[in-house]
């Protein structure tokens, strides 16, 4: 008795060639719906599934293969005499190969203006059931999820590569595939509710590429993306020039994108090791970049730059004068591309860095688990500021403080940022005490600190940071407030004529 293969696919790529190969290898082919028609129209002998089940397709195609004649043929173990006896008793023949790919749920849910009903109708039921049945019984059933495996399976059928390990590999692929498919469906339904943190949280990612290594050469790594992309992200960026991104490139570029999205004005951000080394805003992207560069001309070397406006020729000339790993921007003018592509080692990424990302959850893995939290989207405006000192800040100081506040939000805690005239001039990042971060920022700013403002991501537990700021000539301070010793810091500000405002918002970043 000939072997049987059941084929039911939504993606018809190379399916005719695969069916011909199976036929040449002696398989009887069973099929349904559009796949059946395609195979038959190609002149290949094919048996409709309803001839096997004795039931027609029904409920608008919702029920085709959900039948014991199909699943018995997939799940019956050939080495189990009781299974074989029961199959013979009920007239069930074995099915030896299944080729199924699923309804295009992912593609459907990403269509603009798609209806909820269309999304529902693209949830596959029979397909995953057949795949899982076949994969469970992988010792007896070859299972194929897509065109990339057709040639491998055809080769295995006629050679010694049809091994236990090969079949188990295909089965593992099935369970990853159906788990990912179900995760996308689960997350779609979750998005239709107000529930944020359910009892179980399902995520799935698709591989973008293997990476040369991770943070260090001895660490293996790969880059994955969310399968459903509802907004522009680094994973959807278009690379216009340069070699592939490294693990550290991806981390740093994402950090730069997160920061530059804070600003409505033309802005440029330079990042090293996921911390900003320079941020500038201006009336043009060229001016903004010049300010970001001058913020720290040393640290920007080998860094990543993000711009929230198209890169023009003037800005490209500035960028080309220094060694940069990556420049990411909404677009690059043709002259800018001509200038920058002359540098072999630079990567150019095109991405809409003005899109909103403030509604998304963020996931961080820990050993044995994960932390999930809402994106830190809290914004502070001039109206939110509480002046707590005798001195009132000037309009310029308020503007600089709000600018510095946006910057310090993205600096690793403990974080201090000094700013002046729409430009960061000192960044103290990742220190175990706040005064240490302040000392680093003040030292970096040097003489520029005279008349500058200081932003702190959290409150001052003692007045030492304010004292250091006073010695450096800082004229205004923005911080959350909330310490038991707030008044000590206020007193020092009043002593030295410094304006200080509270935001009542903390921006820890780990």
From Swiss-Prot:
SUPFAM superfamilies: Cytidine deaminase-like, Methylglyoxal synthase-like. GO terms for biological process: 'de novo' IMP biosynthetic process. Residues 1-145 form the MGS-like domain. It comes from the Bacteria. Pathway: Purine metabolism; IMP biosynthesis via de novo pathway; 5-formamido-1-(5-phospho-D-ribosyl)imidazole-4-carboxamide from 5-amino-1-(5-phospho-D-ribosyl)imidazole-4-carboxamide (10-formyl THF route): step 1/1; Purine metabolism; IMP biosynthesis via de novo pathway; IMP from 5-formamido-1-(5-phospho-D-ribosyl)imidazole-4-carboxamide: step 1/1. Keywords: Hydrolase, Multifunctional enzyme, Purine biosynthesis, Transferase. Gene3D superfamilies: 3.40.140.20, Methylglyoxal synthase-like domain (3.40.50.1380). It catalyses: (6R)-10-formyltetrahydrofolate + 5-amino-1-(5-phospho-beta-D-ribosyl)imidazole-4-carboxamide = 5-formamido-1-(5-phospho-D-ribosyl)imidazole-4-carboxamide + (6S)-5,6,7,8-tetrahydrofolate; IMP + H2O = 5-formamido-1-(5-phospho-D-ribosyl)imidazole-4-carboxamide. Disulfide bonds: none annotated. It holds the Pfam family AICARFT_IMPCHas. One of its GO terms (cellular component) is cytosol. The keyword Ion transport does not apply. Belongs to the PurH family. The IMP cyclohydrolase activity resides in the N-terminal region. PANTHER family: BIFUNCTIONAL PURINE BIOSYNTHESIS PROTEIN ATIC (PTHR11692:SF0), BIFUNCTIONAL PURINE BIOSYNTHESIS PROTEIN PURH (PTHR11692). This is Bifunctional purine biosynthesis protein PurH. It comes from Oceanobacillus iheyensis (strain DSM 14371 / CIP 107618 / JCM 11309 / KCTC 3954 / HTE831).
């Amino acid at each position: 008795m000939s072997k049987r293969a059941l084929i039911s696919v939504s993606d018809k790529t190379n399916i005719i060639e695969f069916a011909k190969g199976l036929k040449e290898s002696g398989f009887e082919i069973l099929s349904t719906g559009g796949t059946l028609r395609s195979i038959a129209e190609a002149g290949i002998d094919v048996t409709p599934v309803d001839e096997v089940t004795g039931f027609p397709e029904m409920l608008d195609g919702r029920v085709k293969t959900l039948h014991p004649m199909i699943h018995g043929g997939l799940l019956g173990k050939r080495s189990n005499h009781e299974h074989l006896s029961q199959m013979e008793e009920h007239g069930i023949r074995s099915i030896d190969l299944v080729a199924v790919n699923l309804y295009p749920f992912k593609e459907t849910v990403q269509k603009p203006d798609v209806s909820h009903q269309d999304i529902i109708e693209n949830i596959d039921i029979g397909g995953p059931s057949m795949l899982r049945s076949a994969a469970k019984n992988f010792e007896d059933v070859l299972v194929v999820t897509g065109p990339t495996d057709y040639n491998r399976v055809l080769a295995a059928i006629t050679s010694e590569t049809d091994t236990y390990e090969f079949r188990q590999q295909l089965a593992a692929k099935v369970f990853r595939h159906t788990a990912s498919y179900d995760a996308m469906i689960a997350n779609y339904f979750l998005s239709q509710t107000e529930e944020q943190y359910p009892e179980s949280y399902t995520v799935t990612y698709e591989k973008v590429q293997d990476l040369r290594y991770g943070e260090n050469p001895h660490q293996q790594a790969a880059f994955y993306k969310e399968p459903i992309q509802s907004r522009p992200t680094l994973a959807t960026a278009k690379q216009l020039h340069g070699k592939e991104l490294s693990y550290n490139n991806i981390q740093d570029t994402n950090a730069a994108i997160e920061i530059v999205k804070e600003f409505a004005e033309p802005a440029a951000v330079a990042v090293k090791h996921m911390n900003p080394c320079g941020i500038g805003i201006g009336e043009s992207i060229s001016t903004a970049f010049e300010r970001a560069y001058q913020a720290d001309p040393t640290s920007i070397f080998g860094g990543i730059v993000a711009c929230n406006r198209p890169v023009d020729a003037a800005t490209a000339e500035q960028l080309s004068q220094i060694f940069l790993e990556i420049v990411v921007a909404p677009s690059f003018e043709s002259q800018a591309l001509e200038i920058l592509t002359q540098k072999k080692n630079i990567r150019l990424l095109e991405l809409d860095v003005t899109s909103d990302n403030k509604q998304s959850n963020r996931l961080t893995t820990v050993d044995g688990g994960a932390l999930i939290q809402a994106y830190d989207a809290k914004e502070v405006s001039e109206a939110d500021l509480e002046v707590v000192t005798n001195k009132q800040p000037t309009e310029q100081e308020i503007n600089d403080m709000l600018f510095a506040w946006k910057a310090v939000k993205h600096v690793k805690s403990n974080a201090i940022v000094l700013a002046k005239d729409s430009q960061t001039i000192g960044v103290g990042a990742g220190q175990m005490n706040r005064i240490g971060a302040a000392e680093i920022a003040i030292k970096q700013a040097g003489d520029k600190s005279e008349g500058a403002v200081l932003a702190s991501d959290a409150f001052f537990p003692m007045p030492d940071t304010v004292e250091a700021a006073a010695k450096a000539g800082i004229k205004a301070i923005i911080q959350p407030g909330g310490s038991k010793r707030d008044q000590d810091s206020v007193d020092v500000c009043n002593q030295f004529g410094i304006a200080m405002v509270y935001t009542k918002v903390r921006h820890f970043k780990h």
